[in-house]
């Protein structure tokens, strides 16, 4: 279940929203699941399924380059360079079932059944379904289930949102995409219910030894509605909180009902139920105010490294304290439960603490394993690939620069080539997880070789240069990345300059701010950051000079408050009063500013 986080689950279990989850915690074994950077779902779920690091399994982005046309298409199992647990279990004679796992299209031929991620109505609705199932005879049934479960009535949506029925109907009739909360909720519910129905029906029919099911909505509901969920964020309107503030708890109550059904199946069959996420999610005051946009790929800003791991059933160790596990431990744990040795590509170990009778098996060499065979997939047109990319952008998974649907040239050979996003993600993995700046730099440069105007590797090269102490190069790459993204650089420039100041490098901070002010003369935010730097350095007149040109036209209380601060420093009481009165006229909800104004008036 994507994006599960203990903070939210503990709260919903305690308040009675998720009684089945509370039972899981009480009767099973739980752990914090350590993930790794970058916190991007296709990468992490492929590590969970293979036990291999990203630079080994090679699923590194939401997209790949078609080896025949050079077009960007949705990431597929063709990018995966190693076998998954279902291949290993199938080859060992176990019956397996897979439903909806990230990057698994076309469906793989296994000893059992296989439904690829293209059966999900969230990202793949309206795209070719051919090749989504093994045996292929399952495909007509998949289409029927998706159509039936995907038909979410307006009255059903009304159970989740506090929106008048007429507005729900109007939102759905406009043809809006996932950027519309009502439409997004309908697709999240459709995907959740279709995935669950397909998995449950096939499990009941086939009773495999291993069933691997991926639920996407537990993450998507956060990306769409977490900003409207209490406690209220400064960037969230009260109207949105009133309309959508209960969506998350109501959706997780639905998830709890589905979990209860799997618990009953596990009890009936004496099976072990494992539930894990790929990463956690920010649900408290640490939630970012950045929303999905065409400039920033913001989805990963909401993720945090600590996810969720739960085991439940006869073999689970009951009521043990919450432990610690790694995402790399998932695959060897599952293989050990099936009495199959882990593979040498797996750096993790079986989570023995979570089970009463589990023992880690010796690593196996599998040199002559049969290759993965996949069914024939229906080709995807450039238009269809573009629609997929637009959905990813609406959810904050891709920036606008990454939605271009063609690469400079077709890939060599039969395997898909890596996109600029894949190289950038690999660089982040090398820099932040492996701690190998040389390989990280090489990956970022490969990303720029494909897309010279791609802002993210520029920014990441700036981070590398800053870590190396090369402030001039850090400034160069940072300003290049800000120019490429074509948005107000003030918040980022300010954060970097304050960090330079905090580390005692005021010269680097001033250089960055002055160059930024020249590059962005119309940016009030940059001017405000430069003025605050001058103020911190004790030069109130330079601070005033850097920002005063924006005073006549500004509608930003922060600018007026900063100017009042400088005027206070210069003992210009009348100016202070005028500026603070104007600031409070724009935003009366500033109690500290109101107190400052009162003190100035009473002197």
Predicted feature residues:
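TPR alpha-solenoid repeat register
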Residues: 422, 457, 491-492, 526, ...
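Residue-level recognition of tetratricopeptide repeat
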Residues: 419, 454, 488-489, 523, ...
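Short, structured active-site-proximal loop/turn typified by the sulfatase FGly-forming signature C/S-X-P-X-R
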Residues: 7-47, 51-54, 95-99
């Amino acid at each position: 279940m994507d994006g599960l986080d203990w903070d939210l689950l503990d709260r919903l279990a305690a308040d009675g929203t998720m009684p089945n989850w509370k039972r899981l915690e009480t009767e099973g074994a739980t752990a914090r699941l350590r993930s790794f950077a970058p916190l991007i779902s296709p990468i992490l779920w492929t590590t969970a399924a293979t036990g291999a690091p990203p630079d080994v399994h090679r699923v590194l982005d939401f997209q790949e380059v078609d080896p025949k046309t050079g077009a960007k298409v949705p990431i597929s199992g063709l990018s995966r360079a190693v076998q998954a647990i279902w291949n290993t279990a199938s080859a060992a004679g176990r019956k397996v079932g897979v439903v909806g796992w990230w990057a698994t299209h076309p469906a793989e031929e296994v000893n059992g059944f296989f439904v690829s991620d293209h059966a999900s109505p969230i990202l793949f609705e309206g795209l070719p379904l051919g090749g989504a199932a093994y045996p292929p005879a399952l495909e007509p049934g998949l289409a029927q289930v998706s159509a039936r479960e995907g038909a979410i009535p307006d009255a059903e949506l009304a159970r989740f949102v506090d929106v008048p029925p007429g507005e729900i109907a109007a939102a759905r009739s406009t043809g809006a995409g996932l950027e519309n909360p009502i439409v997004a909720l309908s697709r999240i519910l459709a995907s959740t219910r279709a995935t669950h129905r397909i998995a449950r029906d096939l499990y009941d029919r086939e009773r495999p030894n291993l069933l691997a099911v991926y639920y996407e909505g537990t993450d998507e509901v956060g990306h769409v509605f977490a900003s409207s969920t209490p406690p209220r964020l400064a960037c969230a309107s009260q109207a949105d909180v009133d309309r959508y503030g209960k969506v998350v708890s109501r959706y997780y109550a639905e998830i709890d009902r589905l979990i209860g059904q799997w618990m009953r199946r596990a009890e009936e069959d004496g099976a072990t139920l494992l539930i894990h996420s790929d990463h956690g999610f920010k649900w408290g005051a640490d939630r970012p105010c950045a929303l999905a946009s065409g400039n920033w790929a913001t989805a990963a800003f909401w993720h945090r490294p600590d996810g969720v791991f739960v085991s439940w059933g006869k073999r689970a160790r009951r009521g043990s304290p919450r432990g610690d596990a790694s995402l790399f431990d998932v695959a060897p744990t599952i293989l050990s439960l099936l009495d199959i040795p882990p593979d040498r590509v797996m750096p993790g170990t079986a989570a023995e603490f979570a089970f009463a009778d589990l023992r880690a098996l010796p690593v196996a060499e599998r040199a002559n394993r049969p290759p993965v065979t996949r069914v024939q997939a229906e080709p995807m047109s450039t238009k269809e690939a573009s629609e997929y990319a637009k959905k990813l952008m609406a959810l904050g998974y891709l920036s606008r620069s990454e939605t271009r649907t063609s690469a400079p040239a077709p890939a060599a050979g039969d395997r898909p080539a890596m996109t600029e996003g894949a190289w950038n993600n690999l660089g982040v993995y090398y820099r932040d997880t492996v701690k190998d700046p040389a390989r990280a730099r090489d990956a970022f440069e490969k990303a720029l070789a494909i897309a010279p105007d791609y802002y993210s590797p520029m920014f990441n090269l700036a981070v590398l240069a800053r870590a190396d102490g090369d402030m001039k190069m850090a400034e160069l790459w940072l300003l290049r990345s800000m120019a490429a993204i074509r948005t107000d650089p003030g918040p980022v420039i300010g954060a970097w300059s304050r960090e330079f100041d905090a580390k005692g490098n005021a010269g680097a901070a001033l250089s960055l701010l002055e160059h930024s002010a020249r590059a962005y003369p119309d940016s009030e935010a940059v001017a405000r950051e430069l003025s605050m730097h001058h103020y911190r350095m004790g030069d109130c007149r330079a601070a005033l000079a850097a920002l005063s040109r924006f005073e006549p036209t500004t509608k930003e209380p922060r600018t007026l408050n900063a100017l009042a601060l400088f005027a206070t420093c210069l003992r210009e009481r009348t100016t202070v009063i005028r500026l603070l009165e104007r600031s409070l006229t724009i935003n009366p909800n500033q109690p500290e500013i109101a107190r400052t104004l009162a003190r100035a008036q009473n002197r």
